[in-house]
């Protein structure tokens, strides 16, 4: 974790593999001459705090949104007010959503958290987004490119 200033904190190397997306199985990293499954230690997440509210920005959330959120809560001492991230629940190699059981389990975890709003991008996938929307209701919104948000 690196606190850049009073408003910005970046962290990476998220531990835990709870509700890990199977879409990660096809993603590799080069280590020496080998290509093991990518552990995403390099993936960075950003906490932005302004006017007493904190937003988590987590890119495609390859480490799993549940694991990233837990790390963010450990850093903050509480849940962020909003999360902006793809949830990585669509497997582009196979052209399909992650299994309903995984999507539903992610939805249950997010529903039980104290985050006010989640905004998610393309790598969540349309089918997974619709399932999550049924669980999270107005707490979940889409994040198309060029959008403006107020937290």
Predicted regions, residues:
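Non-globular, low-confidence helical/coil segments that flank catalytic cores
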Residues: 1-6, 137-151
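Proteins with a high burden of low-complexity, intrinsically disordered sequence enriched in S/T/G/P/A and R
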Residues: 1-2, 24, 103-106
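Active-site-proximal loop/helix segment associated with metal-binding centers of metalloenzymes
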Residues: 3-51
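Active-site donor-binding loop signature of nucleotide-sugar glycosyltransferases
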Residues: 13-15, 85, 145, 151
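Short secondary-structure boundary/hinge segments and terminal tails
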Residues: 21, 91, 128, 150-151
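Cap/insert and terminal regions of metallo-dependent hydrolase folds
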Residues: 39-41, 45, 49-56, 60-145
């Amino acid at each position: 974790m690196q606190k850049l200033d009073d408003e910005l904190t970046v962290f990476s190397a998220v531990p835990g593999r709870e509700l890990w997306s199977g879409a990660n199985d096809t993603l590799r990293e080069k280590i020496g001459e080998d290509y093991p499954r990518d552990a995403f230690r390099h993936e960075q997440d950003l906490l932005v705090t302004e006017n007493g509210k904190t937003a988590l920005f987590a890119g495609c959330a390859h480490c799993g949104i549940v694991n990233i959120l837990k790390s963010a809560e450990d850093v903050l001492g509480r849940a962020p007010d909003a999360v902006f991230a793809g949830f990585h629940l669509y497997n582009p190699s196979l052209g399909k959503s992650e299994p309903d059981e995984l999507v539903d389990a992610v939805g249950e975890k997010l529903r039980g958290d104290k985050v006010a709003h989640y905004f998610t991008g393309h790598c969540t996938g349309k089918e997974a987004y619709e399932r999550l929307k049924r669980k999270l209701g107005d707490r979940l919104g889409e994040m198309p490119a060029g959008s403006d948000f107020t937290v």
